Amino acid sequence: STGEELFKAKACVACHSVDKKLVGPAFHDVAAKYGAQGDGVAHITNSIKTGSKGNWGPIPMPPNAVSPEEAKTLAEWIVTLK
């Protein structure tokens, strides 16, 4: 599956969109914040798998039911969305 296919098939769309903030940040903003960092893909992958809080406001992101490979595919796609 591609990152975009996973984004649509998994729960991501409940809180995120590519270009505007919903409950969670827009993926454009995530790409802008982490895409240029050497560990950006790893950071996003970890956040997808284990959850995240405090980076984008008060609402935490829960851990997501995706495989490590799916999380990495999603993260690699997200950083291309600058």
Swiss-Prot record:
Function: This is a prokaryotic monoheme cytochrome, unreactive with mitochondrial cytochrome C oxidase or reductase. It functions in nitrite and nitrate respiration in Pseudomonas, but it is also found in other bacteria.
UniProt entry tagged with the keyword Metal-binding: yes
Name of the protein in its database record: Cytochrome c-551
Matches recorded under InterPro entries: Cyt_c-like_dom, Cyt_c-like_dom_sf, Cyt_c_ID
Keywords, ordered alphabetically: Electron transport, Heme, Iron, Metal-binding, Transport
Pfam family for this entry, one: Cytochrom_C
GO molecular function terms attached to this record: electron transfer activity; heme binding; iron ion binding
The UniProt record lists the keyword rRNA-binding: no
Binding site for heme c: C12, C15, H16, M61
PTM (free text): Binds 1 heme c group covalently per subunit.
